[in-house]
């Protein structure tokens, strides 16, 4: 919502690519605590200051975001899958299926989220277990690969991701989900 990955992806795809920054109105209203502005204001600032002319904002919830099926090469879900999963795993599966429909055959869905552990209150801590995400991806029909690149061993998974002692340095998983050809 705040534009961190939007900035990176805009630079990665260059002038010939397009980045769709999809958010909900509710998500854009959250306060970006490090910058004392809303997520929407932070996103707009990154777009303006970064000269990100290839970014198109979509402020609508899934599934009806106005993009054609089989039209996207890559989608990223950054630290929000737990928000869908923890209240209702079926809702998370539906989201993955909706995103899969938007991807071209062979397209990639990247997912990163805060790692939770069994037996802890992952909902209140805004986390989820890696295996839960992998099982959802397999149920949705994706090929699944994982990476350890976002792991943070100092996070023992016992605190909310918003705990200031973590300074946002949470232990995260990274999954590469591929839509079959």
Which functions belong to the PLM regions below?
Residues 10-11, 91-105:
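A short glycine-rich, Lys/Arg-flanked "PGG" loop and its adjoining helix->strand segment in the class I
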Residues 106-115:
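Conserved beta-strand signature within the Rossmann-like core of class I S-adenosyl-L-methionine
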Residues 52, 65-76:
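A short acidic, Gly/Pro-enriched loop at the edge of an enzyme's catalytic core
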Residues 44-47, 121-147:
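Conserved Class I S-adenosyl-L-methionine
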Residues 2-14:
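Conserved SAM-binding loop of SAM-dependent methyltransferases across substrates and taxa
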Residues 31-65:
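S-adenosyl-L-methionine
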Residues 140, 156-181:
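Core SAM-dependent methyltransferase catalytic element
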Residues 62, 73-90:
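A short SAM/SAH-binding and catalytic strip from SAM-dependent methyltransferases
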């Amino acid at each position: 919502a705040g534009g961190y990955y939007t900035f990176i992806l805009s630079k990665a795809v260059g002038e010939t690519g397009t980045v769709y920054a999809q958010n909900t109105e509710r998500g854009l209203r959250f306060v970006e605590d490090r910058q004392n502005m809303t997520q929407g204001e932070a996103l707009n600032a990154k777009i303006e200051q970064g000269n990100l002319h290839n970014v198109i904002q979509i402020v609508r919830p899934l599934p009806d975001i106005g993009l054609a099926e089989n039209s996207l090469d890559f989608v990223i879900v950054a630290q929000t899958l737990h928000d869908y999963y923890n209240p209702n795993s079926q809702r998370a599966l539906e989201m993955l299926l909706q995103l899969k429909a938007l991807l071209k055959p062979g397209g990639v869905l990247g997912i990163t989220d805060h790692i939770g552990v069994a037996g802890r209150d992952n909902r209140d801590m805004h986390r989820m277990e890696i295996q839960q995400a992998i099982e959802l991806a397999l149920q949705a029909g994706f090929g699944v690969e994982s990476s350890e690149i976002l792991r943070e061993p100092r996070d023992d998974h016992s605190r909310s991701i918003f705990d200031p002692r973590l300074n946002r340095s949470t232990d995260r998983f990274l999954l590469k989900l591929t839509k079959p050809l």
